[in-house]
Every structure is written in C-alpha cells, then in structure tokens.
Amino acid sequence: MRRTLLLSLAFCCGTPALADSYRNCGQDWQRPAAAPARIVALNQHAADLLLALGAGPSMVGVAYLDDNGAAYKQGRYQGVPVIAREYPASEVLYAQRPDLVVGGFATAFGDGITSRSRLAGNGIVTYLLESACNGHSLDYYGHVRRDLTVLGELLGRQARAQALIEAMETDLTQARTIAPSGKPLSVFYLDSEVRGLDSEGGRGFVTPLLAAAGARNVLAGIDQYRVTINREALLSSDPDVILLADALWSPASRKRQLLTRDPVLSSLRAVRENRMIDIPFTQLMPTPASGRVALELARQLRGMAVP
C-alpha cells in the first residue's frame, strides 16, 4: 500500500502543471485562471487570428477595421460587434467587461488606463501580436507560429492552433513550388499615397511575403520598416509589378487613379502594362492567412512573369 502511494505521488509530482504565466513581447504575464470568455480584438487582423482559432463565440467586440467598410456600417464583423471606428475610448473598452484584449499594433494599448500594465492590474489579460512588439525580430512567420501557440493555449484551442500552423507551412511550401522561375519579379508596394509614396523597406513584412511568392521588394535593400520615396526614385527602379494595399483610408482604386493620371508615374512599365495587384490591407499583415496570401500572390505573379 505504501509503495502504491509513493508511486502515485511520484507520478503526480512528475507531471508538469500548466504554467501560471505566458510570455509575450519578451515579458512574462499572468495567465488567466480559466479560458477567456469575453474577448476584445483591437485591429482587424488581430480579430482574424482569433476567429481563425474559433474564438468567435467568446468575442464581445472588435475595433479598428482596416479594409471592411461594410462591416463597420453593419456594426458587426463576422458576427462580432464593432465597438469603435478606431481604438475605443477607455470607458468603451472597459464597458465590454473583457477578460482578454488582443492588439494587432503597439498603438492598440494606450499609456493610461488602457496600457497593458493597467489592464493587467484590473484583472484583464492582454496580448500583443509578436510582430508588433518593440524590437521584434524579422522572423515574421515565426511570430505567427508563436501567436497561434500562445493564444491557442490561453483559449484551450491547441489542436486548432497546430492545424493552422501546419496549413500555413503547406501553403508556403506550395507557393515556392509555383513561383515564377528565373529572375524574381521586382515589386513596388504602395501602402498609402496620402502623404507621399509610402512603402516598406527590408524590415517590413512585405519583403518576406513577396520572397515567399517568388518576387522581391524593390526597396528590400533599405534597412527600415517604413519608407517614403519620391516619383523620380520609383521611376528609376521601374518595377515589374506594383502591389496596391486596399484600405479604408487609402483605397486601391485611388492609388490606381494616381498612378494612371500622374504624368511621371503613368510612364512606369507596370502602370502602362497594367501589372498592378490590389490586395486587402489586412492580408499584408503577418497572420495565419499569410501562407494562403503568399500562394495566391505566387499564382498572380506567375501570370505576370516577364518573358
């Protein structure tokens, strides 16, 4: 009997208990006692990740939709109430009585009572997508895997998280197999035309996204996240293809209008030959859908390959 008891104790002690903390943005945070049941997503791509994990029934709000104006007008995004056009005021956020708030960009969390530390002090768990953490690495697909793994554990959806990771890897592998052969197509990414020709340099996610699709970012050699160039610089690079972000504040249609009507930009090869691709803004963020996005880009770029 004594031996049986000792074996039972040894077995219990040898079984690892669920850690009482989780790691995010290089810090340890208190893990919730139970799976979150009132989740708020700040930024559309953060909501997309949660929805992909199957957390929709537990989501009580989403704010800051980037490319879905219809959902904002309807007041619901894939069944989740839209609580603010941009980031919600503190009273609006707290009124949702959230037990988990997930942000897509660092700006999602303020400096006051909506900061991560103040929210934690009020018993609200927070998570910031790893690609938005200060000083993050450039392993964007690794960030997606990490987001899925940690949030999958917090939500009790580990199997779903693993399935999403495997699906992303499969899509990335397939994208590489169908990418155009030969010299990679040069692509200029136009993020916004509001304050100039805003794009991304080598540190932005567009660079590895295009690489996965068999192309190269013409600004990859610039060691910055955000880059604004002038017309003359773009003309000198004369990219094979132009990628246009479609966002509520900067629609792809408006970018096309600029490119086709501007006396300088209209002379670009990609504009003259209509080798321009519209893509929803949120698909240009690192999310579980990034493998599928790279695969679709590879297919489109293959059809635009220069002989």
Regions found by a protein language model. Name each.
Residues 89-103, 230-247:
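Proline-aspartate-enriched helix->loop->beta-strand connector
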Residues 38-96, 100-107, 218:
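A short, structured surface patch at a secondary-structure boundary
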Residues 20, 33, 111, 115-193, ...:
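Extracytoplasmic substrate-binding proteins
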Residues 24-26, 80-91, 222-231:
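Short helix-initiation/N-cap motifs at beta->coil->alpha
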Residues 15-19:
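Sec/Tat signal peptide C-region and signal peptidase I cleavage site
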Residues 4-13:
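Sec-dependent N-terminal signal peptides
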Residues 63, 200-226, 273:
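His/Asp/Glu-enriched short active-site or ligand-binding loop at hydrolase and phosphoryl-transfer sites
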Residues 107-121, 241-260:
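A ligand-binding cleft/hinge motif common to bilobed small-molecule-binding domains
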